[in-house]
Amino acid sequence: MSVEMDFDLGPLTWIKGELDNALDAAGAALADWNGQDITPLKAAAAHLHQVYGALQIVDLQGVSLLTSETERLLSEMAEQVEKRHHETVDTVLRAIAALKAYLDGLMAGAPHAELKLSPIYQEVVARRGGEPPAPSELFYPDTATRASRQEPEMPLDDAARTRAIHGARSQYQRGLLLFLQNRDAMAGLTQMELAVRQVERLAPGAAQFTFWWTAAGLMEMLRRGRVPTDNWLKRVCGRVDLQMRRLMEGSRQLADRLFRDVLYYVAQDDASEGRGAEVRQHFQLQRLRRFLQ
């Protein structure tokens, strides 16, 4: 599978009845809530905990996350009188309805794109008083797929590779500073792209190559003004620098969340040429664009 829209309904079919019953029970417990009684809140939380447990046998990370956050919100309402508002229960009921609609949609053949749950997920998190989640929070592309090298991997020993990556990282950091401080953003983005493309050539192994090949697509899009620059994207650029440092220090472990975030922003564009287009085709991201915020 290359995108989250492909989904095996088998395991969900086995537990769908249990999920429906528990979600219905959670909604029923809250239907006539009087604004103060904590018993319905605890009952609804318990039913959502049952839903969360049942979901562990299916690959529905976003659905599980929304369920867990909604359960936590109910538990906090039961424990903290200042959080007991009818508006908050309304949010919970809409979250339950969104979960039911999403699961029903999957069973009816709707695309599996958990980004559709982002608006209600963000509202639940806000009701809890948490930091706003990243726009890519419910974006789950298949980061295990690998891109093919056009040239053989560079035959470098560890010391030579470290030196070369160190040089590329220094260039990236200079460009990142220009970009973040908006002093000469275009020059900064050009340096960042050149540095990432150099690391792409130096990357050892298929997994590292695929990540840096993808990151180069994002840098190209930034330089061309093909993706809106927001604070989340700036954070992603900073985390790319940290990933560069890890590689320079000899670690081949990839941060899956960073990979997802890079792909999320690459998916924003619809250009038919350039590295970004190659990345979107490789990961079939075009199919998800209509669900992006």
Over which residues does each language-model region extend?
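Structural secondary-structure packing elements that flank or coincide with functional cores
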Residues: 1-9, 81-158, 225-293
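A structural signal for well-ordered alpha-helices, especially hydrophobic packing surfaces
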Residues: 20-23, 27-30, 34, 52-59, ...
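Short, well-ordered alpha-helical segments
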Residues: 40-44, 58-73, 87-95, 206-219, ...
